[in-house]
Structures are given as structure tokens and as C-alpha cells.
């Protein structure tokens, strides 16, 4: 009952500020190989305050966007099931960051581990400025 329509100008202002937001995601992912706590530790160390480059293709044009990953933690849930907590800049395409998006996101979790990682669930836990 407390919902109201958003004006287009308000939506445009919010989208323009998306880079300023810090978003915390919880990602449940399935890996191609079994994953260990050492893999999680190496990801945690590698992705602390790391820039991630994303490429977007629109016809012949290729756009490049740089985003920050501030923190990456995780825990092994099963043999090939892992849960990641990722704190990053608001404009990061999180699914592409996890699976690599066919080389369009570099570095990615799958590229760093050296095997396929497929996100199953993505939840937003927190959004802050």
C-alpha cells in the first residue's frame, strides 16, 4: 500500500549514481571441480580491492567498464557447491564476474580458479553509498 510510481527523472538520477553504491551480494555457485578452502583463501587474497574490466558489445562498438571488487569471502557448502559474499561497486555485472562471461569479464572467479563456476542464486544483502 505504500508503493507509488517513480518518475522517469528519479530513475535516471538513481541509475547515474549506481557507480557510487557499494553492494554486498551472496552468490551460491556450482563448480566444475571440487573446491577447497585453499581455493577460497586464494580468491579472498586475489580479489581484495581489485579492479575488474567488463566488455560490452553493441554491434561493432565495444564498451569497456571498470568496476571495483572490495572484498570476496566464501565458504564451501558441498563438494562442488560454494557460497560467496562479494562486496563490490554497484555497476559490476555479478553473474559475469562469477562465470567469466566468455572472457568479457577479466579477472573473474572462474578464470582465476581455472575451471567453470556457474552461479545458481544471487541475493543482494546490502546497498550503501
Annotate the PLM regions.
Residues 1-129:
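Non-catalytic RNA-recognition surface used by pseudouridine synthases
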Amino acid at each position: 500500500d505504500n508503493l507509488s510510481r517513480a518518475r522517469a527523472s528519479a530513475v535516471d538520477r538513481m541509475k547515474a549514481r549506481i557507480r557510487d553504491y557499494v553492494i554486498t551480494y551472496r552468490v551460491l555457485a556450482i563448480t566444475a571441480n571440487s573446491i577447497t578452502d585453499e581455493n577460497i583463501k586464494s580468491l579472498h587474497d586475489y580479489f581484495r580491492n581489485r579492479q575488474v574490466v567488463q566488455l560490452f558489445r553493441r554491434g561493432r562498438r565495444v564498451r569497456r567498464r571498470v568496476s571495483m571488487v572490495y572484498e570476496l569471502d566464501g565458504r564451501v557448502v558441498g563438494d562442488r557447491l560454494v557460497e560467496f559474499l562479494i562486496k563490490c561497486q554497484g555497476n559490476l555485472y555479478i553473474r559475469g564476474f562469477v562465470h567469466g562471461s566468455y572472457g568479457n569479464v577479466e579477472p573473474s572467479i572462474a578464470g582465476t580458479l581455472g575451471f567453470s563456476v556457474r552461479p545458481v542464486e544471487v541475493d543482494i544483502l546490502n546497498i550503501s553509498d
